[in-house]
Amino acid sequence: MKKVLCILFCVFIVLSFAFGSAAAEESGKSVTRVYFAGPLFSQAERDYNLKLTKLLEDHDYEVFLPQRDGIEFATLQDKTPEEKNKLLFEKDVSEILKSDVVFFVLDGRVPDEGACVELGIGYANNKRCYGAKTDTRSAELDLELNPMIRGCFIRLFSNYDGEKLFEEIDRFLSENEL
C-alpha cells in the first residue's frame, strides 16, 4: 500500500508539471486561498472537515472544501464513469492551482490517496502545504509518516486530542499566516 501511494504521489507530481503554473499568483491578492485536502467519505470525516474549515474561515482564509464547493452530485448524474472522473479531477486540479495553500488532513489508517495526489500537485506548483493529524494508529505502531508526504509540509499539526489540535491551529493562525 505504501508503495502504491508513493508511486501515485510521484506520478502526479510529474503530471502536475504538465499542467504548469496556470494559476499564477495575482498581484494585490488580499485573501489567502486554501485548498482543503483529506478524506471525505464518511459523515464523521465530512463533519470534521467542516469544523476545521470553519476555523480557517474564522481566520479570514477563503477555503475550497471539495465536499462543499466541488461539483454538485446532480451535474454528474448523466455522465459515464470516465466523464465523472475527468470532471472531478479537472475541477480539483483547477482549484489547487488557484489556491495559495494546501491544507491536508492525514487522519486514517493511511493518508487518503486522492489527498496525497492533491498534496503532490500543490507542492509541485509551489503552494504552501500544511498537514493536520489526530489519528493515533500510526503512532501506536511506531510508524513514521512517509518522508515523501512529510517533506511537503511547512508545518504538521499533530495532536491526538482533536480539540487540542484545533486549539493549536487556532493559536498558530492567531500569530502567523499560512
Labelled PLM ranges:
Residues 1-4:
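Positively charged n-region of N-terminal signal peptides that target proteins for export
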Residues 6-7, 154:
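General helical structural elements
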Residues 7-8, 123:
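Composition-driven detection of intrinsically disordered, low-complexity segments
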Residues 8-16:
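Bacterial N-terminal signal peptides
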Residues 20-178:
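Conserved catalytic or regulatory cores that recognize and/or transform ribose-phosphate-containing ligands
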